[in-house]
Amino acid sequence: MESTIGIDAGGTLTKIAYLNEKKKLTFEKFYSNEQDKIIDWLKKQTSIKQICITGGKAKQLQQLLSDSYKIVELNEFEATLVGVRYILKEEKYDINNFVLTNIGTGTSIHYIYNDRYIRAGGTGVGGGTIMGLSKLLTNIDHFEDVIPLTKVGSRKGLDITVGDIYGGILSPIDNSLTASNFGKAATIESNYNNSDILATVQGLVGEVVTALSLQFAETKNIDHIIYIGSTLCNNIHLQNIISSYTKYQNKTPIFLRDGGNSGAIGALLYATNKKS
């Protein structure tokens, strides 16, 4: 039986969404620079005839696949929105207006109004920042190795908090808020290890991304911020940082179970509906 798959070729990861033999939504993930592995996997799936490709590296991958498959292109923001809408429905959320923050290699932020999206902005701080700084500071360069170490790390020896600055004096804002990411590394002798460094890197990224998302949400008086992206996958530490900061500012954070695959899901649904 002929089948269709959706591919989201991102800057760091390439995600694939397809229906398995039991018609269950299934995912595969590869590093985007491992194109040989992607092609080898596709060759083993002999039923695939059509591929819908989205993402920043879609053109590169399309050039390698166009002779073997029918290719459908889709704008990555449209694909992501289709995927997010599908996941929201599956997870029983009834939300029409929200800020969508997609933490990939960098971070892209959109306003979503029903089926309409408007790019609010973004930042170069994202998953690529986590991996780049992790490599520079600890020489650890695999996301799968970063996550377990981050879980046991502490930011206390590296970040300066508001409480550190004010001491016992009453401060105008919450003492637990970060006053300077990595600030203690330059000012005092502090005991820290690789786990602490990795936890602090994630704190930096999480707070920058959340602060920007909150500013956009506040500007348009939007209550819900949906955070997606592969950077959040199994990354409870980063999710907790984002969640607590978002709630502190009286906004509602939402993390979708398969949010990192939303682009691939959207591509699959778009091509499947177009075909039918």
UniProtKB/Swiss-Prot annotation:
Keywords for the protein's UniProt record, in alphabetical order: ATP-binding, Coenzyme A biosynthesis, Cytoplasm, Kinase, Nucleotide-binding, Transferase
CC terms in the record's Gene Ontology section: cytosol
EC number(s) stated in the UniProt entry for this protein: 2.7.1.33
Record-listed ATP binding positions: 8-15, 105, 127-131, 143, 230
Main location: cytoplasm
Protein's cellular compartments: Cytoplasm
Gene3D superfamilies, per the entry: 3.30.420.40
Reaction(s) this enzyme catalyzes, per UniProt: (R)-pantothenate + ATP = (R)-4'-phosphopantothenate + ADP + H(+)
EC class of the enzyme, as a word: transferase
Active site (record annotation): 76 (proton acceptor)
BP terms from Gene Ontology: coenzyme A biosynthetic process
Pathway involvement of the protein, from the record: Cofactor biosynthesis; coenzyme A biosynthesis; CoA from (R)-pantothenate: step 1/5
Domain of life: Bacteria
GO terms, molecular function: ATP binding; pantothenate kinase activity
Nucleotide-binding recorded as keyword: yes
Reported function: Catalyzes the phosphorylation of pantothenate (Pan), the first step in CoA biosynthesis.
Record's subunit section: Homodimer.
UniProt family annotation: Belongs to the type II pantothenate kinase family.
Name by which UniProt lists this protein: Type II pantothenate kinase
